[in-house]
Each structure stands twice: as C-alpha cells, then as structure tokens.
C-alpha cells in the first residue's frame, strides 16, 4: 500500500449499494407516481374492495331544539322552496319547518275527520310540495292529500279493514303504509289483488295494476305468501318503478313506464349474511280479531331513489346498499350522526342533500 492513500474494502464500492438503493428509489418515487399521476387514472378508478363500507357523516339537519319537539319523526322531506316537512307518527301530525331550521309549525293535527290524522302510517311528498298521508281511523285505511300549507285537497277510504302484514318497532307495514305519491295519483302495494302495485287516481278510482307476485314457497299459507309479497313501490325519475320486497329473500324489481318487468335482482353482501342466517323457516303466529296471522319481521327497513335513478335500500341492520340503474350494487354505506344510524326513512332534497331519520340529519356527497 502506498503512503498517503487508504485502502477501501470492496464492499464499499459504489456497485455494492445498487441492490439497496434501487428498491428504495422505486418505493419512494415510482410507486407514488403510479397512485397520484394523472397518467395512471385507471389505477385510481379501481372498484371498491369487497366488503368495503363507506361512512357518510352528517353535514347538517334540524337543530336539537327543533327535533326535541317531535315524538317519533318517521319521515323528513324538503321541497323546492327550502321548507322541510316532518311526519310525526306518534303525534299523529305533520309539521313544517322553515329552511333556517327554526321553530316547527303543526300543519296537520290529530283527528278522525277529513283533514286530520288518526293512526297514521306513511307520508310522501310530490315535487310541487303537495303531500299524501296514509292513516287508519277506526281500522279502515284512508289516504289524504294536502297542499304545502296543510290544507286538505282530497281523500278516500280503501275497502276492507287494515291488515298488518309486517311489523317492526310497533309499526305495521303493508297496504296504505307503502304509499308513493305521484302528484296526480297514488301507488300502493296491495298483493291481495294479485298484483304488486296498484295505481289510484285522487278520487280513489283504480287506474292500473303492475307486477306479478313472486313465488315464495308459502303459497299454501295465504297470509304468509302475501306478507312475503309486501313491499314499497318507488317511482323512477325516467318513468316506471322500482319495487323492493320488504320481507323474506331480499329482492327488488324494475318496471318501465308501461309496467313491463325489466329485471329482478337479489341483494347480497356480507352485511346481510347474519340476517339471512337467522331468518326463520317457520314464522310464529298471532291472533288478531279471531284470525291467525304470521308474525313477519322485515329484512328491509326503507328505500328511496335518488335523482340519478340509483336505488338506496336500508336494512334492519345499520347498512344501506346502493344500486345503479342496471341493478348492479355500487356501494355499501353506513350513516353517522351522533352515532351510527339505522335509517327509518331516506329522501333526497332539492339541494343535493340526503335526508335521514331518525335524527332529521342531512348528508352530502351521495
């Protein structure tokens, strides 16, 4: 070794570091480029991983001092003027709330006569702000139409006695409780007629029937068969309906404006697996006015259609599935207000907000 020079072992030569430096450079520079660069947008657009649940957090809603007025807000709607409507089932009333969220005004009150409510079960609003309420004074199903101020416009009774085919939380579901208000008419689920959907004019005259009942395997038990064909008709923005079955196998159908079946889809997902596993093979019975009826608990709690025609279905478990116009599931969602919500109603307001009860919350980014 010459004087004035030091010896450098071979493992300190530059080539020695190549196996260590290259992976570091790839991880530090190349991989982030794949994820963030516009050149690789295909990677960003990959569908959500199976089992992923998106959490939507409330961005607004009615203030607590307003919500505390209501006993059981079962529906929360907003019309183009910004006014909110709250349907309070336990108070047998409908309230209007200014867009500022100020004190509510009771615009429809309790009572059995025309223009009042007794044992109400459902509520729906047309785009022009007129609304329909279903109730059952003295056990007879009735539908009433009101203007945005609560003034009575029309109403009629349906023949026969009200029958609860499905119940959850003390609320009976079926018949008038499945009302969809069309503005110039009303759509109901009445499986006892042999069809899934019956449209009525505002005078109470049947206009047309849509959809055949589904096979349930319980055709020999008429009441159970009808319960498994209980569901909600949901008008589609382009015409026709979605129909969501509330009990039994979770299924929905899509009908066009002429009433023709376009498709049927079975709703599946890991969030539903525990519910389906616990579904009874034999349903318990109960006696009402001397007649026996099956005690059926729903799988689906509520459903709604957004302005783009996507179907949102909320289950008894605190999860909601979203399906596109072709019936394909695109999202699994949970709602968070003060805590995780199990929606009892969903609606889409005129300002791009999703309105949810309980809690009268608003969500953005749907």
Residue ranges and their predicted role:
Residues 19, 23-40:
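Bacterial N-terminal signal peptides
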